[in-house]
Amino acid sequence: SLKRRINRLFALDRFPSFAEFRFRLINEPSYLKRFVEEITVNVTEMFRDPSFFKVLHKDVFPILATYPLIRIWHAGCATGEEVFSTAILLQEANLLHKSILYATDLNPGVLHVASQGIFSLQHMKQYSENYIEAGGKNEFSQYYSAKYNRAIFNKGLSSKMVFSTHNLVSDRSFNEFQLIMCRNVMIYFDEATRR
């Protein structure tokens, strides 16, 4: 939970009081950056919950296809697995060429990782299984090249992506979108914030 992660950081950095902890958060940008990196959860995988992606491809993409330009926002994109998963399916549906995928996160460190389009090769077997279960049409390995222990995803996918920091709670929407995906972050918000 969020409370547990904050308490862990508070104890780890041995603050004598919450007031001192709060003071550092407010007055030291470098500590605020550390705080954000420590409390955000960035565990995700490609085609996580394959049935979701199957429905996205089968039921949502035909509606998106009616738009001249498709704008999709991946809010809380973490290290980018979900946005790359969506790009792959858009390409297979012949929709990527007219799409822009906006990938945002509060944590600039994970955004940098996401923008590289490089993932651990050890996860590709699981991602490939998820891809097939999600209704993927091709060999999953055609979307990346293996180099040492890394899978480097094709630049044709990331060329349709825009990466930026964004705080869902305090920042406004920056465009109009046909689809907003925030599956990685909604679980952390209370009911009032979700609305």
Which residues make up each language-model segment?
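Short, well-ordered amphipathic alpha-helices
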Residues: 55-60, 83-91, 115
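Conserved hydrophobic residues forming the short capping helix/wall of the S-adenosyl-L-methionine
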Residues: 10, 90, 118
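Short strand->helix junction
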Residues: 42-46, 79, 170, 187-188
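Conserved AdoMet
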Residues: 1-73
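Short helix-capping segments at alpha-helix termini
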Residues: 92-97
